[in-house]
C-alpha cells in the first residue's frame, strides 16, 4: 500500500482524491490537512467530507500530518505559494510529492525545482490523462501543419478560478511555441481596439470565466478553407484526481528529480 497524505483534504479536489483513493485498493490515506482555523481541523476527514469515518484526523499543517504518520507521497492541489512551502517540507522529510496547483511564477517554479533535488516531484498544471494527450496531439498537429495555419488557444473555467490563463492553457502555449519555433514574445493574451492584421507568428491565448465550468480547453488551427479544433471538456473533477493518483503511484520510491505527466504516462520526448 502506498501511504498518502492529501493537503486540502476537505476541499473540492481533496475530497475527490480521498474518495477515489479509498476505492483504489493500493493507496492508503494516512493524513490530511486543511487551512488553519478551518472547522474541519480535528475532525475525521471522511466525516468532514461526508464519506464516512476513515480514521484520518484533519490537521492544520503538513508538518503535523507527517509527524502523525509515515508517508510515501503527498498530493497537493492547494496554491502555488503553499505548494512551494509543502515541497520544502517534503524535501526535508524525504517524502515524494505530486503537485497539481497552478499559477506558478518563475521564482516559484525555480523553488519547486530546488526541492526536487532532494525528493521526486511530479508537477503538472493538469493531471487529466485526456488533457495530457491533447497537449501532445496539439504539438504534433502544429509540427505537421506548420506556419500555414494560425493557432489560437481558448480556455473556460468557473467564476471562482483565481488565475488566468489557466496553467493548462499556458502549457499548451508553451508546447505550441516550441513546435512552431516561436517565442514567448509571439504570444498575445488580449485583443482590443484597432489592432491591425494578425501577425503571422502570433499565437492567441484567450480566457473565459463564468458559471460552474470545471474546465474546457480548445486549440484552433485556422487555415485557408479549413479549420481544425482540438478540444477537451471536463465535466467533473474525477479525471484530475485519477491522474494525480496515477502520478502518486508512479513517483513513490523514485530517485529525486522533477517530472511532469508526460513522464508518468511514458510519452517519448519529441522536443
From Swiss-Prot:
GO biological process, one term: lysine biosynthetic process via diaminopimelate
Record pathway: Amino-acid biosynthesis; L-lysine biosynthesis via DAP pathway; (S)-tetrahydrodipicolinate from L-aspartate: step 4/4
Any one GO MF annotation of this record: NADP binding
SUPFAM superfamilies in UniProt: Glyceraldehyde-3-phosphate dehydrogenase-like, C-terminal domain, NAD(P)-binding Rossmann-fold domains
EC number: 1.17.1.8
Residues binding NAD(+): 8-13, 100-102, 124-127
Alphabetically ordered keywords of this record: Amino-acid biosynthesis, Cytoplasm, Diaminopimelate biosynthesis, Lysine biosynthesis, NAD, NADP, Oxidoreductase
Stated role: Catalyzes the conversion of 4-hydroxy-tetrahydrodipicolinate (HTPA) to tetrahydrodipicolinate.
Protein name: 4-hydroxy-tetrahydrodipicolinate reductase
Amino acid at each position: 500500500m502506498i501511504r498518502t497524505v492529501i493537503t486540502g483534504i476537505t476541499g473540492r479536489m481533496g475530497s475527490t482524491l480521498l474518495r477515489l483513493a479509498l476505492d483504489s485498493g493500493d493507496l492508503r490515506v494516512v493524513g490530511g490537512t486543511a487551512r488553519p482555523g478551518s472547522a474541519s481541523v480535528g475532525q475525521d476527514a471522511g466525516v468532514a467530507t461526508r464519506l464516512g469515518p476513515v480514521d484520518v484526523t484533519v490537521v492544520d499543517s503538513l508538518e503535523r500530518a507527517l509527524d502523525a504518520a509515515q508517508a510515501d507521497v503527498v498530493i497537493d492541489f492547494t496554491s502555488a505559494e503553499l505548494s512551494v512551502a509543502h515541497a520544502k517540507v517534503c524535501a526535508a522529510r524525504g517524502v515524494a510529492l505530486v503537485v497539481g496547483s497552478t499559477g506558478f511564477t518563475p521564482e516559484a517554479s525555480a523553488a519547486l525545482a530546488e526541492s526536487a533535488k532532494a525528493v521526486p516531484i511530479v508537477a503538472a498544471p493538469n493531471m487529466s490523462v485526456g488533457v495530457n494527450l491533447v497537449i501532445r496531439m496539439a504539438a504534433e498537429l502544429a509540427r505537421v501543419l506548420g506556419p500555414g495555419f494560425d493557432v489560437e488557444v481558448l480556455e473556460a473555467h468557473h467564476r471562482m478560478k483565481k488565475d488566468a490563463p489557466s496553467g493548462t492553457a499556458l502549457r499548451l502555449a508553451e508546447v505550441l511555441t516550441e513546435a512552431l519555433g516561436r517565442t514567448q514574445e509571439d504570444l498575445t493574451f488580449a485583443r482590443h481596439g484597432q489592432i491591425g492584421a494578425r501577425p503571422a507568428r502570433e499565437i492567441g491565448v484567450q480566457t473565459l470565466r463564468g458559471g460552474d465550468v470545471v474546465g474546457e480547453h480548445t486549440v484552433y488551427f485556422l487555415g485557408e478553407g479549413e479549420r481544425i479544433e482540438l478540444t477537451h471538456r471536463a465535466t467533473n473533477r474525477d479525471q484530475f484526481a485519477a491522474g494525480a493518483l496515477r502520478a502518486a503511484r508512479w513517483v513513490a520510491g523514485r530517485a529525486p528529480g522533477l517530472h511532469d505527466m508526460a513522464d508518468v504516462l511514458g510519452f517519448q520526448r519529441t522536443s
